[in-house]
Amino acid sequence: MAGPTAPTTAPTAIRAGGPLLSPVRRNIIFTALVFGVLVAATGQTIVVPALPTIVAELGSTVDQSWAVTSYLLGGTVVVVVAGKLGDLLGRNRVLLGSVVVFVVGSVLCGLSQTMTMLAISRALQGVGAGAISVTAYALAAEVVPLRDRGRYQGVLGAVFGVNTVTGPLLGGWLTDYLSWRWAFWINVPVSIAVLTVAATAVPALARPPKPVIDYLGILVIAVATTALIMATSWGGTTYAWGSATIVGLLIGAAVALGFFVWLEGRAAAAILPPRLFGSPVFAVCCVLSFVVGFAMLGALTFVPIYLGYVDGASATASGLRTLPMVIGLLIASTGTGVLVGRTGRYKIFPVAGMALMAVAFLLMSQMDEWTPPLLQSLYLVVLGAGIGLSMQVLVLIVQNTSSFEDLGVATSGVTFFRVVGASFGTATFGALFVNFLDRRLGSALTSGAVPVPAVPSPAVLHQLPQSMAAPIVRAYAESLTQVFLCAVSVTVVGFILALLLREVPLTDIHDDADDLGDGFGVPRAESPEDVLEIAVRRMLPNGVRLRDIATQPGCGLGVAELWALLRIYQYQRLFEAVRLTDIGRHLHVPYQVFEPVFDRLVQTGYAARDGDILTLTPSGHRQVDSLAVLIRQWLLDHLAVAPGLKRQPDHQFEAALQHVTDAVLVQRDWYEDLGDLSESRQLAATT
């Protein structure tokens, strides 16, 4: 056979993601996605140690919780829309738009002159952050081969966990040494770098069919949640509980929630189908997830306020002194996920977690201005461990007890309740704190003869003489510890519900117990295909092999020929043309090593060759179809152990299985089945 023509540049018109992107280009894209997720995740916690300074400069202690709450709400509401818009417009366009929105929100946050402007800017920033997070996961799934996807997405998930440590530290340092405004502006240069890579390196990817988006459901649940949080935050502080404003908000929220339930029962693509709550396991997990979010963000937000006003800690020191809680949370969360994945037992963990949270808040309610920092750190470790024991395992329980068709919405549902709980926790802690402080601050100011402007600033407060500062410090200490005492009742309710949690056998379809993104991140809308791919990617390392296929009756091809056949099929699906020189270039192997194998395909009628260009013949396409049937059957045999699949209607599962089978054929690199290069040469030389 004539040798190939002169090498051509590798094709760039990619129709679908896969392993044929060069490793360098793929890693550049993935690094940009990691940094995108990093700035989105950091935005959630970086503001926490800066809050006392922000309140001192902008005023309005009543509205301080909105600096955290509005970000969470904005990110949660946009998740479903961003995922569906990615299907409709293309992931890269949505990523570019999301980063722009995030940058605009970050700039406006840094320019804010009032707490109201900051809250609105934070909501805009949260919208961008939520869209970045969900789009980054989707893009990683498209540019990374199926077999490597778990490892890459695990890195994205770990970013959320790492950020829980680094966010408060960075926010504290920037506040002390630059300005609290830099806690927002620091995102801009990183985001511009992400924009540059996304605009230049991400290929044009295939779009799935036009999705169905539950716009009305998203709008209604956003209105209901926002109204409830506003009522919680303003009740008893800005407005009396019996005022027309608060009553109107509560009535409006109740009407919106009722309409949402009615609407979701009839929606074609419901974001939270009411049928999910027919499962006692799902219903209890949602409530427990709410409690976990309530405790985690409530504590993360108000512990630094305690440390600043009561202990006189700087913003940097406050960030450092929250580390015991975060470390306890991370260790307990990852360890619990691994243990549940190995043992299949889960009930003990949320029970123990809720108990530890109740004990921790009770201990924290006994703190005062003389409590040693070491003892405070111990209490925070207990609190973090309690949150960690509960948080990750709740996602895992829902993923392993839901039916196949509901896995995506069930996972995003339980995560949604955690985020809503975090919003309510921050708002409730803030409202209680303002109420308790107002009762004490007047007498404290009188007894200490302190000028009012000195009160909002922790730094100024602790520079006052002891006789003047002590009554104010005591007022803050008693108010915050009373808030912690109120939190005990919420965790006790969670403990009782955890005791009622029914333990059922776990399925095998989703055991990504160490994916911190599920526990720490925003909700992610997963389709049935996404869920099935999660199961398949775990089976691939020890899964179907070309050697197994070659031994099947009627195959008629050896391992090397099967590999060559699939390479032509992959390149035809992914590129405009199949060139032998391009195959060698992508594999970093001289094309002459594999040329005899492709020539044998031509001789047997499975392929045709015109110089450097290869194509499959009708016989070759039929052979690929036969391989797809064998792979599909292998997947069915191994997925049959998952009870959730047995309850799934055939048509949806069949469609998802076909999608995943095709992804295996197109995205899997079968090169490892040939062994090392010397074995490949021997196979290529064999007739």
Swiss-Prot record:
SUPFAM superfamilies the UniProt entry points to: MFS general substrate transporter (SSF103473), Winged helix' DNA-binding domain (SSF46785)
Subcellular location per the Swiss-Prot or TrEMBL entry: Cell membrane
KW Transport (keyword) present: yes
Gene Ontology MF term list: transmembrane transporter activity
GO cellular component: a single term: plasma membrane
Main location: membrane
Topology in the lipid bilayer: Multi-pass membrane protein
InterPro entries for the chain: MFS, MFS_dom, MFS_trans_sf, Sugar_transporter_CS, Tet-R_TetA/multi-R_MdtG-like, WH_DNA-bd_sf
UniProt KW keywords: Cell membrane, Membrane, Transmembrane, Transmembrane helix, Transport
Transmembrane intervals: 28-48, 66-86, 94-114, 126-146, 154-174, 182-202, 211-231, 243-263, 287-307, 320-340, 348-368, 378-398, 414-434, 480-500
PROSITE patterns given in the database record: MFS, SUGAR_TRANSPORT_2
GO annotation (BP), single: transmembrane transport
Family statement: Belongs to the major facilitator superfamily. TCR/Tet family.
Protein name, as recorded: Uncharacterized MFS-type transporter Rv1877
